[in-house]
Regions:
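Ferredoxin-like alpha/beta domains used as RNA- or RNAP-binding modules
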Residues: 1-35, 59-83
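Residues that recognize and position ribonucleotide moieties
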Residues: 24, 46, 53
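Short, well-ordered loop/turn sites that connect or cap secondary structure elements
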Residues: 47-48, 67
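Short, structured beta-strand/loop micro-motifs enriched in basic residues and often containing a Trp
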Residues: 50-58
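Short beta-strand/loop turn elements enriched in aromatics
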Residues: 34-47
Length: 83
C-alpha cells in the first residue's frame, strides 16, 4: 500500500551580499574575511579545505583562488558577489 502523505518543503532563498574591491583581484580567503563570512584567516582556511565554499557554483578548495569583479562565493546560505 502506498503512503499518500504530502510533504511541504520550504526553500530558503539565499541572501546576496555585494562587496566592492578596488584591486584587480582578491584571494578567496581574504574575500571571506572582508565580507565577515569568517572570523579569521584560520577559519577561512578550514571552511575552504572542508569544501564548504562554492565559487561561481563550483566547490573550491583553493585558499589562494583569485576572485575578480563578477565572481561569486557562496557560504552558509549567503552569496557574496564582487562588484
Amino acid at each position: 500500500m502506498l503512503n499518500n502523505r504530502k510533504i511541504k518543503l520550504k526553500i530558503k532563498e539565499k541572501e546576496v551580499i555585494e562587496k566592492h574591491i578596488t584591486t584587480e583581484f582578491i584571494r578567496l580567503d581574504a574575500f571571506l574575511k572582508l565580507c565577515d563570512a569568517v572570523q579569521s584567516g584560520g577559519h577561512a582556511k578550514i571552511v575552504i579545505q572542508d569544501g564548504e565554499i562554492k565559487v561561481n557554483g563550483e566547490i573550491c578548495e583553493q585558499r589562494g583562488k583569485k576572485l575578480r569583479v563578477g565572481d561569486k562565493a557562496e557560504f552558509e546560505h549567503k552569496i557574496y558577489e564582487i562588484i
